[in-house]
Each structure stands twice: as C-alpha cells, then as structure tokens.
Amino acid sequence: MQGTQQNDMFRHVVFFFIFHLFCVEVHGVEAFAMEIAGLVTRVQPLFLRTREYCKPYLTDKTPEFSVQVTAEDLSFQQSLLEAEAVEEGLKIRMFTEPFLERATIQRRIADYLLARNTVMLHGSTVAVDGKAYLFTGPCGTGKSTHTRLWRELFGHRAVMVNDDQPFLQITSSGVLAYGSPWSGKHGLSTNVCVPLAGICFLNRGIENHICRISAKDGIQSLYRQIHMPVDEDFQRKALSLADDLAGKVPLWKMYCNKELDAAKVSYSAMRGEYI
C-alpha cells in the first residue's frame, strides 16, 4: 500500500512539473464564449489550442456560465480518468494537459446542463433528413463504423451530429440532439440541433439483426452510457434524465457486421422505411 501511495505521489509531482514547464500562463490566453446545447459559457483556458478545438461553437452571445481552468483542475481530471480506467480494466495512462483541459470544460458544462434537462451520452449520432439516430454501446462495438456506413449510404442527406458524446435535451415534446466539440478521435461533429428519433444499442454480430426493446429492458444499458457526475445530487439528476429519455425515445438492440447492409437494416427499422 505504501509503495502505491509513493507511486501516486511521484506521478502527480511529475504532472505538476511538466505542467509548469509547458503551460501557457493564463493571463496570456484570451477568454472566449461558446454555445453548447443552448448554453453560452465563458471559458478562460490555459492553452491556446482549446479555443481552436471549440471553434465551430464560438459565439458573441452574452455568457450565462463561466469556466476557468486551473492546474489543480487538470490534476483532478487526470485522477478521474485513472479511476475510470481501473473500473473498466484498462491500462492507466497520462493524458496531455490540453486534453485534460478540454475534458474539464466538458465535465463542467455537462454538469451544469443537467439543470436544463440536458444529459451527455456516449455514442455516435447521425442525422438523415432532419432526424437524428444515436448508436451507443461499450467501446469497440463499432459505433463510429456504423454511422460511417450511414454516411456512405445516404451521402449528402446524412449529417454527423457528433461521433462520440452528443448532448440530449429532454423537452415536453421529445428529445433534441446537439453537436459538441467533444467528438472522439475522428473529430466528427456539426453545430446543429436535431430531433432524436431513436437510440440503438450496438453489438458485434455476423448477421444483421435489429429489434425494438422496452424502456425497462434498455434502461440499464442507458445508465452505463450517460455522463455520470462526481457530485451525488448531479448523479441522481443524470439517472432521472436517463429514465425520462428511455420513455421519450424508441430504443433498439442490434447485432451487426461492418457491411453496408447493416446501415440499411438499422435505418429501415428505426425510420420505418425499407430501402
């Protein structure tokens, strides 16, 4: 146990040493405002590249919320990611400071948006003819591959809303899917708001098969894919929104391969139009 504590202490000492060597001083980086899911946030970053990362979402509107990132925030974010890796049985790794800053901003905004009935969910979301379809599941199940097949199938009719972590706003009339800068390794997102027509839980399969499932059958899978805050009150709100989401949007379960026919099968079922 003592050795583990010493290793943790050494890792965080190294983290702060690297941070002070390479961090751009905060007073030298201009603040900016961006709009995510209808929320305008003023961001005071540590790194110049953060503004560029968020460029499609920049706005001149008056901010309603503010995020200022510190060195302590980056260390805390690293510890959160390490805990997630341990929980999922993955290898612990050190993330770059700019990445940790972006993740910190994302987490703060996601937590704040819960009060506006908006939750962030891990999944790849594509829109076709003005309706959005979200594909979710554990890492490695082929979410990005599946939405790429949709784009190949529909061409200009398909718009990539977000390839990794879209925001979903629950309203009295349905659910709206929003793009965001946090869009995975491929950086595929569009600053749009589109009605969500369905959520599909993907699994790898040899043959393509999709079926509708009930909210009761899908809710546990949905819980595992939503953004889970650190604060317990926020956690309860996130779980409550997941319950609402399951009752507002059709849920599907699919086993699929990587052939173009997989996109045809999922679209035909979720849209109700056979192609």
List each language-model region with its residue ranges.
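Long, basic/Gly/Ser/Thr-rich N-terminal segments
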Residues: 19-92, 96
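Short, intrinsically disordered, mixed-charge
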Residues: 59, 110, 114, 152-156
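Extreme N-terminal, non-catalytic leader segments
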Residues: 77-129
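Post-Walker A alpha-helix
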Residues: 146-147
